[in-house]
Amino acid sequence: MKKKILCFQFRHETNVFCPVKGDTVAYKKMRYLFGKESFDNMRGVGTELGAFLEVFEKRDDVELIPTIAFYASPCGYVTPDVYDLACEKIKEAIIANAPIDAVLADVHGAMVPEGRSDGEGDLFEMIRELVGWDIPIIAPLDLHANVTKKMAKCATALIPYEEYPHVDIYETGLNAARLMEATLDGKIKPTMAYRRVPFLLPFFPTEREEIKPLYKIAREIEAREGVYSARFAHGFFPADIEEIGMSVMVVTDNDQALAEKYADELEAAIKAQLPKLKIDYPTLDEALAEADEDGDGPVVIADASDNPGAGATGDTTHILRAILEKGIRGAALATILDPASVEACEAAGAGNYVDLQLGGWTDPKYSGGPLAVKAYVRMITDGKYLVKGKIAHGVIAEHGKTAVVDIAGNLVIITSAPRQPYDLEIFRSHGIQPEEQRILVVKSAIHYRADYGKVARKMITLSLDGYAVADPKGYDYKNWKGNV
């Protein structure tokens, strides 16, 4: 008899400070798929669910049970209708296909639904109540997961990414799927130890020297006999739940004591390194002065605080305003979220000028207020392109209806749907060659470095006003009680 593996994707990275909710509209803009369609759209795509399919669809002794593939761009709280529907569809699939032999969950690890504090933990608990405690539940996680006690209790194994930028999304999915495969084949019995490290880490790229010693220790532990995985998650501080922060997960083969021992070792190493895990950010004036100097290749300025990939609104005007005030030319900016301006550009038509009140529509304090500009409309597109870089390779990125305009010698991509523009195809698909620009401005914190590093002579990350400040000291927490 074939072994039945329930597979689903239900992802959200929740920034509770963002006023835009993770509702049905937000999910439909990105990914909102049911049943067989959830597999058909993820097959051959560089996601965790795509990795599950890659490993198990080759086997004729396994039946993969499709459920849902829900993904929305990071934003505010997930609304109850979305969360409840996802849980109901997963529950229905479990009941209809009972008995289930295993569950592979493609989740982020930092979901906060309205009225709840632990989206994934509550979901895993529901699944456990339905399938019991004897079958494996394994989940790859985002590096920025806030791993809670409930998540660790209800899951058999949790394996977060190792890289930021997240160039190892697919590899981590394969890792989790292969652990499940070995488990079902009787080659391994996963036992996991979990430690919570109550510290809020800034958005910290794993290429920085300060954090490299921790990955060296984790990989040394992972290479030891009896260990399958030794990982730590950075946490996602804008979620503002009681259990935000760093965490450690060590998975061994049927040896809980060994897992506990090595989890203690990795936790101690992290705590010893914490005083060094700090980042200083330059001012906007400093960044623009450096970027405006002549050099070979563009300078990339990343606006981390308006990163849609961390739940920001994507509409801030701080950097564009400063560029225009300083008379800088030759910059290309991706992106400003402003559906009304896109509609105005479409009405004017490509090849014509249009007066815009651009961006800054969410909140003058955070978004900078709208910019009154005269823009030359270069093109209108559907905002879709194929991601060609390593992060989410093969995914169709969708920014909604999009306008490309020239404002005083600077090119600006205006979109209708929020999405982090971490792939250079955001420019190329809109007629802009990134290598030929003096300055590239991107609404991203760290992910941009994976692809933009191919063309940049320098990359500068800023932490300005916005809903996704790069430094955890920038928030007024209501639920978090630990150390920053």
Give each language-model segment a name.
Residues 1-2, 58-61, 66, 92-103, ...:
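Glycine-rich phosphate/diphosphate-binding loops that line cofactor/substrate pockets in enzymes
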Residues 53-74, 78-82, 86-94:
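Low-complexity, highly charged intrinsically disordered N-terminal segments
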Residues 66, 88, 271, 384-484:
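Extended hydrophobic packing segments that form well-structured cores
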Residues 6-13, 17-18, 27, 31, ...:
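Active-site histidine-anchored catalytic micro-motif
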Residues 184-212:
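Internal, active-site/partner-interface "lid" segment
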Residues 203-408, 413-417:
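Hard-cation-handling environments
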Residues 57-61, 95-99, 129-132, 160-163, ...:
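Generic secondary-structure signature for well-ordered alpha-helical cores
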Residues 2-58:
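N-terminal amphipathic/basic leader segments beginning at the initiator methionine
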